[in-house]
Design a protein with these regions (language model features):
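A short beta-loop-alpha structural element at the N-terminal edge
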Residues: 4-20, 74
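Conserved acyl-donor/pantetheine-binding loop and adjacent beta-alpha core of acyl/acetyltransferases
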Residues: 78-134
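Conserved beta-strand in the GNAT
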Residues: 58, 65-74, 131
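Conserved GNAT-fold acetyl-CoA-binding loop/helix
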Residues: 27-44, 84
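Conserved acetyl-CoA-binding loop-helix of GNAT-fold acetyltransferases
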Residues: 129, 133, 137, 141-158, ...
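A short helix-loop-beta-strand connector motif used in the catalytic cores of GNAT acetyltransferases and
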Residues: 43-58, 74-82
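Conserved GNAT acetyl-CoA-binding A-motif
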Residues: 127-132, 157-171
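Conserved active-site alpha-helix within GNAT-family acetyltransferase domains
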Residues: 152, 171-190
Length: 202
């Protein structure tokens, strides 16, 4: 088994991080981000990894290849503002997927509106406080290390003073949903049905 080490991800890792997220579709194909393609993911992570409130831990093998990552924003409101500030570049990156599948435009628009703290905004993700985001690992590598990686990320957050974190999990993502309930002992706050019919637990 190859040696795996953990470190904080940097903006220069955006391409590899996006590639790992893209390969999640080998196990789970749902989600607007996967629908928008790898080019969009690269543009997104280039922005996210440069956000001062982002904590992203990645796992790296002895060849320097990133095998997985887990990330959390310590300020979901600031992150939403940052994403909206880059809406043009993200829109351009998503354009190819939207041209191929015009129905995606409605989903993208709803997701964009959900970034607002307005009472009328769609409730799809948490938009305030500390928000857990993605936890991804390449399919053919030592996935047990992914749990260690996630725990390290959470320990860093704890050391930084975080005592409460919100996140969302689609019920269809059965293994992750059960892990958070039974192992992480996460407490469901709300269950919603997304416009595309997916059931999401927050």
């Amino acid at each position: 088994m190859s040696e795996i080490r953990f470190r904080l991800a940097k903006p220069s890792d955006a391409k590899e991080i996006a590639n790992i997220h893209w390969h999640v579709r080998e196990r789970y194909t749902q989600g607007i981000f996967l629908s928008l393609g790898e080019s969009f993911l690269r543009a997104f992570y280039k922005i996210i990894l440069d956000d001062p409130w982002e904590v992203t831990v990645c796992a790296v093998n002895e060849k320097g290849k990133i095998l997985g990552f887990a990330n959390t924003t310590m300020d979901a409101k600031k992150q939403a503002e940052n994403v909206k500030k880059h809406k043009f570049s993200l829109g351009v990156a998503a354009l190819g997927a939207i041209i191929k599948h015009p129905s995606l435009f409605k989903e993208v628009w709803i997701r964009y509106k959900s970034l607002s703290n307005s009472k009328n905004a769609p409730s799809l993700v948490h938009t305030e406080g500390v928000r857990g985001e993605y936890w991804c690992w390449l399919k053919d590598d030592d996935s047990l290390k992914s749990v260690e990686m996630s725990n390290i990320k959470n320990e860093i957050l704890y050391d930084l003073g975080v005592r409460e974190m919100f996140f969302e999990v689609d019920k269809a993502n059965t293994s992750v949903y059960k892990y958070h309930l039974k192992v992480n002992r996460a407490m469901p706050v709300e269950e919603i049905t997304l416009p595309n019919g997916r059931v999401r637990v927050m």
